[in-house]
Amino acid sequence: SSDLEFSIIDRYFKRTSKVDVSLGIGDDSAIITPPPSQQLVICTDTLVAGRHFPLETSAHAIGWKSVAVNLSDIAAMGAKPHSILLALSLPHVDEAWLAEFSRGLFDCCDQFSVSLIGGDTTQSTQLTISVTALGWIDHGQAVTRSGAQIGDYICVSGQVGDAAYGLKHLGHPLQQRLDYPTPRCQLGQQIGRAHV
């Protein structure tokens, strides 16, 4: 780890964590105290510039989306999102871009009561963002794909295809659905509690 890496972390990504995070950003690993009778749900998504978002996407939108796509996966399992880890690979350090990216990331974290508890930054030839999200669910209550049975209902929330349309028609109002997806965290938890 370099002085530049620690400077980026301190300036753009270090914030107070939840009370159950005994050790967060700044050490080699984070330490979390798990709630009783809960299971940990973990997922990771990687976003690559030019593949998962257009190169001209605002840094704020990229920050938001990098968190939101992971929270959607946590919600799909019926879990309550808790925290994220961020691995950020940058082609160059751009202070204005980092400020907007971190603002978008924390705007999404704050809206869904999620803490950034660690991660890594490095330099690379291409902008790549990997977020790992952690959530909690009551033991044995996860909604899994493999748990689906013949006769079960398959439900979709939101409008299918809006983000894809926004990608093909940049500048159209539906691009907002591509840039700022809305994780259905409350709905996911309700489905999980209902044992659906």
Task: Describe the role of every protein-language-model region.
Residues S2-R193:
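Helix-biased detector of long, well-ordered alpha-helical tracts
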